[in-house]
Amino acid sequence: MTITIELPDTNEQRLILLRDGVERGCKALLNNLNAPHYGSVPDFDAAIYGEKHLLRENEGWQAPAPELIRAWFGQFQTVFTEYDSEDKLAALFGLHGKQGGRRIRAFKSGEMPIPYGIWRHFLVLTGRASQEIIPVLGIFDMTPKNGHQ
């Protein structure tokens, strides 16, 4: 007796996983709206720094002033004590190694402008910007169907 199990081809399996990932992503985005709410930095008026630091790169983004970086990073580090050092904050942003904490200090001091990707990551983490959803322009197979290309 032979038992046969019909499985979808690898491209169809990948599409199933893609759909599952999209559904999980939608749930995660909705769940982000339930994050705890925190007030603004006491005695700090972020409005005087304009809004260009909140824009996307293709909309005319400009690096934020170091005073704003210090204030917002400082508040974040006070609220989330697991990131209370520059090294820990650097690791959160994917800056690993001995220079990560030094780079955070350089952003805070104005010695070095903060890169867009790190700043955008921070804005999303703090609910100051929404995550960008990249549109899928096409779903391309990774393997030939039925042995044909």
Feature-to-residue mapping (PLM):
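Surface-exposed polar/charged interaction patches
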Residues: 24, 32-39, 75-82, 110, ...
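Short, basic-rich loop-to-helix N-cap that marks the start of a DNA-contacting helix
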Residues: 109-123
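Recognition helix of helix-turn-helix/homeodomain-like DNA-binding domains
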Residues: 90-113
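Short alpha-helix boundary/capping elements
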Residues: 97, 112, 126-130, 147
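Short acidic/histidine-centered micro-motifs embedded in hydrophobic/aromatic stretches
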Residues: 92-95, 121, 125
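A short, Lys/Arg-rich alpha-helix, primarily the initiator
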Residues: 42-82
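Short, charged recognition helix plus adjacent turn
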Residues: 2-45, 57-59, 130-149
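Helix-turn-helix DNA-binding elements, focusing on the entry/boundary residues of the two helices
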Residues: 86-87
